[in-house]
Each structure stands twice: as structure tokens, then as C-alpha cells.
Amino acid sequence: MDLKKFVLEGNPVCRKEAVIVGDHFRITMLTTALIRFEYSEDGGFEDRATQMVCNRDFPVPEFRVSDGGEELHIYTKDLEIHYDRQKFSPSGLMIRVAGGKASERVWHYGDEPKDLLGTARTLDEADGEILLSHGIMSRNGFSVLDDSHTMAMGEDGMVEPRQGNRADFYFFGYGHRYVECLQDFYRLCGKTPLLPRYTFGNWWSRYHKYTETEYKELVERFEKEEVPFSVAVVDMDWHLVEDVPPVYGSGWTGYTWNKKFFPNPPEFMDWLHKHGYKITLNVHPADGVRAYEEAYPRVAEKMGIDPASKEPVLFDMTDPKFIETYFEELHHPMEEEGVDFWWLDWQQGTVTKVPGLDPLWMLNHYHYLDSKWKGKRALTFSRYAGPGSHRYPVGFSGDTFITWESLKFQPYFTANASNIGFGWWSHDIGGHMFGYRDDELTARWVQLGVFSPMNRLHSTDNPFNGKEPWKYNQIVETVMKNFLKLRHKLVPYLYTMNRRASRAGLPLVQPMYYLEPEREETYEVPNNYYFGTEMMVSPITDKLDPVTGLASAKTWIPQGIWYDFFNGRAYKGGRKVDLWRDIYEMPVLVREGSIIPLKDMEGYDNSIENPEKLEVLVYPGESGEFVLWEDGGDTPEDLDENWVSTRMTKTADENGTVFIVEAAQGNTAVIPQKRSWKIRFCNIQDKPQEVTVNGQVYKDAEFAEDKKLHGTIVILKDVPADAQVKVTFAADAAVYQRDYAEEVYEILEKAQITYAQKTEVYKVVKELGTEAVPVLVSMNLNPSLLGVLMEILTMGI
């Protein structure tokens, strides 16, 4: 094995024109707001890539240097740097960031960062909030990323300790330009790779002693119940655990299939593949390879150990020979048999033979890059190992408690990870262990999972703990099934956002303050987040109110007009509100003019391939555009020639509303040559004036009422992918008008209050409409009921 394949991509050497250097210091001007500072007593500086940083080849920014003799002054449009040329100290290195209050925008070396935080290594045993590590966004406008203690990357693909006791850090002084800050972080530390398409479907996972027969029966039950999954996660009991001879210790680490449970592993994995599942196996590699393992003889021989000695092969990711053997003799053979990627469940600390080198980082780095060996797209599944870990998706967040407190923390935890570029977390949806059974909690957690980077249902080894929808009450079973189907419908949208995350440096999930950093309210709703270009999500993390039968989520609605994803209800933005929903829905809002492509699913369909049938949601607004991006889904490299784009636009003016699907452009071989389109126009209640394909009237168009979105559905079948579709509505097409009294009636009908109060409230609303608010406020109503009524009567357009 050539270990050079493990060298990080990028050019770690900066441009000479960007450098200001002295006998013991070097300052590198990467951008006008991103500066590298190094100090070395021995006068040596680091030009190799590190575990954190792989590219310093930035265009030289504009800057000015004023040499004041003993002091050095550097100016850019964003920063003033004042440095005394000595060993870095609070009095000797000061940076002022442009804009904001002067007292808040000044940093002295050694100041404790006051940033918006980033993420954490794991949520293991978390029962609510945990401490997070630092990120690169700050309301003060600056942050520091310390790279002094990471290893350097050698040309041979191995990591090496850095020489001397040198200071090496990066100053980010972007003010509130959070998105620009993040994009330059990716340029410095490597981009987020493109994920395989199948990762965006649902994942099934359970710590349970499955047998091959039981697992197949489960998959067939999912098919019968029409519950789609695309990834089968097989936890540790795939290998020998309890049957390991005591002389070898525990069976926590293992590489030998348990043939009692899985008598024919290749056949089992082939069966799963034929049923549309990719496969990942759990592995705890810390105990190395012991003599009972089937692979032991060949592993021992390759490591220079006599197999007859039964001497264990110790786990050591600092040994090139072990790395080669580990992959070629343990993992590659099982990948040949059908394993698609590995769940690296490392829980054994941060110590290796090399001081300061974290074995988790080594596993993530080498596993991810090695996973390309079969000509497929790289993927691993493991815990976070510090800044730069975004290069090794997907993240496994660990073993959380099954409690409302755990659920309440996860939306914030997920969104906040974008502050250190970590955009692809996978949580134990529904929680892993301990806690309690609460069907409503499970339903809300699944809803969050569907609107999360990954949706992986999981539970621990307990006969009472499982996430099969049919194990819950009928209402929650329905909710789980509906949302799991929705996740697979969302794959076209999610995969387009996957491309955006990799190429544009824009994570799928982003905190609300990214786009409105000067609005105080955006910092007050940590559980709200943007979900791609078109949506914002406000998960419900509290129990249903007993009076209304609804639960609420504190929500900041950004400026503009927003529409409920599920029912089309319109909201005026620019305010913070409580949004109330029953168990069947959650607050997901889409901006006006949004176009959202979905897979059109009928019955059971767990395929994540580029769909033949597409469903497109079109929301009101003057204009909108969405470019659907598709490729082969698992090609090893992200090349322009792999992609096909389908541009969709919507315009609405005094002449009417026009929606166009342009002819597909690019590598059309990767999509169906003919497609059917189900286009759902929210709030437009007339049939189109005209439907054309390539300019010719399409007489076979079908029309239906869209009761969910109070609009019209237009259906076109078997349209060539290289054809243009155009749907035109007349300027006077009927538009849905909300019936506020009817909406209030539906709330009152279910409310657990006196009939007299129901009648009184309804009478007031019938008479006064949206002007009823002052009267309702004076009626001493239950606070929850009043909150629901306020949402209906005050937030519409």
C-alpha cells in the first residue's frame, strides 16, 4: 500500500508576497481578515500541512506595512495589527477589528476567546446541554484558531511531530461576516467532501443481537409497512463477542463474523444490497487483532509475528506497517464481501505512542481516505476529532440519553457545529439509552431527524427499546411513517444542498444569525436554523399542551413573507413568535418564491437513485429559482462532467404566474431520459391557462386540487428530460383566502375548555376577524390557547 494516498489535498505553502518575516516571527496575510501568526525561538517555521490546515495558497490580499522600528504596524481594510517583534505577549501583540464598538473589537494575545462556540467530540451520556469547544464566529468580530500543537503531515502520508516549542495560530477578524469567515475556513482547512447520495435516506440502527433471519424479516416488515431506509447499520454483535475465549479478554473489538448469527455474510450483504440498503458495520478497534480472529494468521505474518505464538497484534495507528496491514488484511477483504463503510466507534481516549496525537483523528483520516480504494465515493462514520474533522464525514455524535432534555439540546448542537465547519452530524435519533419511554418524545425526535443532516434511528441493547414505528401508539406510528417517507422524498433537495456544501462552503444547517447577524433576535433562538436555501426549521422540543393539544416552538421568522411547508399558511416575517403545532406537524417555513424538488413517492420505494417521478412545491412570491443538481451518486471524484442540472424558475407579475422547468443540461445519462412531474402550486386555486412542452401545448396534462397547500396540482407524464416544461396561470387566477374563523373553530373544537368559553371566543372572532385580538386578550383565556389564537390572527398577510 502506498501511504502517499493519505497526504492531504491542497498547497500548504503560502505566497511569498503575503509574508512579513523577522528573525523569530512570521506573519502571513492570507486575506484582509485572516492572518497567520508564528513565533519560533529557533527561527524555523512550518510550511507543511498540519492535521488542521492543508492549504495556505491564498491570493495575496491588499495590506500596508508601517515599520516603526521596534514596532510593526500592519493595516488591511478589516484589521489593524500592532506587534513589538518579540515573543507574543498581551502587551506586544494587539489587533483591532474594523466596525462595531472599539472596546469590543480589540484583541490582545492570550485573551480568552468569546466566540459563539463550535461543537464537541461526542454526546456520549449527554442528558441535555454539554460544554462545546471554540468556533470561529464571534459577536465581537474575531476569533483565534490555535494550530500550535497539531502534528505535521509528512510527504510519505504519515504524521510527524513538529519541531520546537513554536506558536502557530490563525486570527479570524471578519466582524459579523459569518458566511465569508466560514468559507475562508474551508479554503484554509479543506472543503467538506461530497457525500454519497444514499446517506441522505433513512438509516436503520439498533444495538441488538440480530440474526441474519431476524434482520431479513425486519427489512421485509419495513417493506410491507412502506417504511423506507437506505442504510443498514449493524452494531457490534455482527462479530464474535460472548464466544471469545476468556484468555483473550473481552469481545469489544472483533473482526470475525459470528456465524451463529450470520452463517453466510456475503450472501446476507448481497441480499441487503438487492433490497436497496448500503451496509455499515460497527467496529471498536482498540484491542487490535488477537489469535482467535480468522484474520489473525495473515495479520500476524504481515506484522512479522509468528502466528503460533498467539501474540496479539496491538492497535497502533502510528506504525505505517500496522496501518497497511489493518486495511489490507482486515477491512478490504470484508469490503470485498459487501461492507460499504465503517462505523468507527472509538471510545478509548486520546493517547497514542506519539505524545499529542489523537488516535481518533488518525482513524478518521486514514479510514476516510482509504475508503476510496474500490473506486467509490469516500465515507466514514465516526466521532469529531477537532477542527478539520469536516474533511472526514459523517460524524457520529455518540450515546445520548432518551430524555426531553437531550432532544432540546440537539437542534442547537447541530446548527452550532457549522461555526467550526462541521456540517454532517448523525445523531442517535430517538436517543440511545437510559431515560424513559415517551411516544410523543420519539415522534418529535424523528421529526427533528428528518430535518437534520442525517436521519439515523438508533437504540441500545434493551428488549423494550426499539425505534420500529409499529412499537408505538397508532398516532405516533403514523407520524413516524409519514416523516420517514418525507425524508426519502427530500433526497433531491438534500443532494443539491450536498453539492452546495462541498462547492460553495455553505452547510445544509446554519444558525439564524448567519444571514441576519445584526438582529438580536437571531441569537435568541438557538434551536432555529436554516435548512438549505429554501427552508428554516424550528423543531418542537416540548410536550403537547393539555388544553390545546398543541406544542409550541419559539421562532424567529426572518424578514419577508414565509409559508408553512406543510399547509401553505402565510406568515409576515421580521418578528419572534411562538408557533403551535399538533403531533402530526412541526414548524418548517419556506421563504416566498421557494421552489422545492421532491421525489414523488407512491407506495413503498426506498430507492435513492435519481427519480423518474418528481414532485415540485412552488410557493407564492414574485420570483423564485432552484437548480436541481444530480450525478451518479457514488462517483469517487466530484468532477463537473459528472453533473446534470435542471433549472426551475417562477415569476409572478401583472401578466400572471409562469413556472418553467428548463431542459436538463450536462451529463443527462445519469438521469431518467423521461420524467413525470407533479407540480404543486401553493395557494393558486384555478387551473393553468396553458401548459406547454417545448413550446407545444401539452394536452395530456392532469389537474387536481391540492387540499394540503390550498392550491392546484399539475401533472405531466413521460416528459423528455431535455424538454422545457412551462405552466402559465392567468393574472386573475383565484388565490386562496384564509378563513380565520374556520381556523379558530378547528382549534376551539379540540380545546379542553368549557363549552361556554368556546362559544364566546368563536363569536368574537366571527364578528371581528383579525380585529378580535384586544377582546381576546381581555377574556382571561388559558395562556396556551391565547398563544395559538395570536398565531392565527396576527401573523398572516
Where are these regions (language model features)?
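Surface-exposed beta-strand/loop patches in extracellular or lumenal glycoproteins
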Residues: 36-42, 545-558, 667-687
